[in-house]
């Protein structure tokens, strides 16, 4: 833990902008044309983009429409107006999407026992959109697989597609067009999308900061979660907050259990484009920690912070995912730390789009990528965990200038975070790295002292 210490630090009050940046309406048509070009290069003559409530990011990225209560499916040909299949409840909402679409009411996407008397069979709708014998159909849901014939859509849709194209056609997984970790269309973001993500990170990180400032023994989990101040924006994952024995599982929702002094504690708050997470113990000092883990900071938090600080410092355009993985392996490779997921991944409207980080990865980081600092120890011991999960983006000189010009207030917040990380925490960032979180790598292991954080300064 050389160079790492606990210190009292004053977090800058960066705040949350009142208005959320919006994408220009024409951006959706531009994205569709970009996807059409990639589809043609890959040999597809039709694309099918499927969405349900949890997996709507691809569809929302392309159309500005995400289904509520039911599923939806976009059919995209090489030219013409895209077609959208929706159930009963999304009919009106799809018609108001920023991307003009030809709507088809497909009532099997509706909830159970709702009317199903006003839609054509799926095969007729798809055939009417140009899918037939010999068609080469690319299918997008939310996962790419090593085998292109593996498709995560409901079987009845895939069966119908394969029946329509016949033995001379093909139906294959095309998710890489949007989410390939090196150059997927949804992996490389423009300035307006990054500004939206910065706003989202202001919301989630300020919420977690407010929670840490108001955390106290006796507060129920269900009361504590209200401190996050969720503003109604669509969530990128369910809200997580647990204390005590249940916190071990990490992913659970809050209960009515009162939070007790000495509890282990974790919370995560994510909306489209951002997620912020912190974890530690509900104490003010090491003397209040549970028996046997008085060295919690030295054994776990200090090495973890040193690893994440080096990971941050290694970020720049052109860096490889394999190098980032090697940093974490060198610091936290001991089985005690229990690191088993990719140490870092890309994010978008969905919390985890893909990851360029794995052992030996030669995928290079690029300008426009939005990344999540997601490095989570799972010790499986009384030491529990620690977490410093925040969002950043990578931007070359041109994109940085564009952001500073178009969104000067966001740029000022980014510069304030960079100064805080360098001056207060001792984390020097490459100019390419834009921190989006108002917590800006602040890691308090003793959660009743949110001003007492790890630092290299």
Feature annotation, model-predicted:
Residues 1-457:
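Active-site neighborhoods and metal-handling regions in enzymes and metal-associated proteins
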